[in-house]
């Protein structure tokens, strides 16, 4: 009683501030964003062919879409790509307009596309960058002294659109099935396990990955190069740390950290880690993000993942544990449950940091 009286007295004595409002429950239609929500992607089948010497990629993707409001225009994101063609349901060709400043492309069809399920096939090409965003190459000095080239992706916040045209906003969740043609000697990893690897010509191979769960575009990832791994498991989930060949043993500490952290999080969140594997990769050098929580393929700049007992300090060991725990927390906070728009990224980051 006294507390209530005290509060009443206090409230009577000060001008009332604006009421505190909880945010509304998420609704896809209300979620902020720049793309129209008339057409929504359901699944992407992405085929890319990479030329890492000439820094070019060509792609063809098949997107299953759900048309929610009949429309003649389908607008999606692209950045730096050239869309060569877009065909709906095996026949209807679109006229394509690109707005490079807005990072979009609009596919204009001769008649309204009806409500419901449709298939969109887009062919395109674009650059592979040398700067660490979108799909890019990372040139580094290998332990052998040779200069080597790694193919890396970094999509958060809005650079998935540099690898494939799509609805590159976090609320547009869909499944992804990725197929990549790359040098035959490269080891390639993505969010999901490899399902098939077949030779292409004399110097390349085509690697296919299993279909992801529904997720946001910014969490898709691909890394390929001269890598080796150390492997373990926890709670039935295979775990691995990949590093440039010759450095993989330095991934042991992070691997053992992940083996302790995964069962703890499975129990803490009450939802078992839902992907069939969790890989972590050390990117040598050219990786501005520091570390990134791509779902099932966590990427780190090498000095926050690799621990070399004779040369690394105890502080490095602590830092590795901290960063691994942070990125693994994102597998739930951010990846499984994602903010509708970037204004709520604090929730992703705040929770992962708190864990
Ligand atoms: Zn984070």
UniProtKB/Swiss-Prot annotation:
Binds 1 zinc ion per subunit. Zn(2+) binds at residues 326, 330, 349. GO terms for biological process: peptide catabolic process; proteolysis. It is found in: Cytoplasm. Pfam families: Peptidase_M1, Peptidase_M1_N. Signal peptide: none annotated. Its cofactor is Zn(2+). Its main location: cytoplasm. Its EC number is 3.4.11.2. It is an enzyme of class 3 (hydrolase). One of its GO terms (molecular function) is alanyl aminopeptidase activity. The active site is at 327 (proton acceptor). GO terms for cellular component: cytoplasm; extracellular space; membrane. It catalyses: Release of an N-terminal amino acid, Xaa-|-Yaa- from a peptide, amide or arylamide. Xaa is preferably Ala, but may be most amino acids including Pro (slow action). When a terminal hydrophobic residue is followed by a prolyl residue, the two may be released as an intact Xaa-Pro dipeptide. Substrate binds at residues 156, 290-294, 349. Keywords: Aminopeptidase, Cytoplasm, Hydrolase, Metal-binding, Metalloprotease, Protease, Zinc. Belongs to the peptidase M1 family. Aminopeptidase N is involved in the degradation of intracellular peptides generated by protein breakdown during normal growth as well as in response to nutrient starvation. This is Aminopeptidase N.
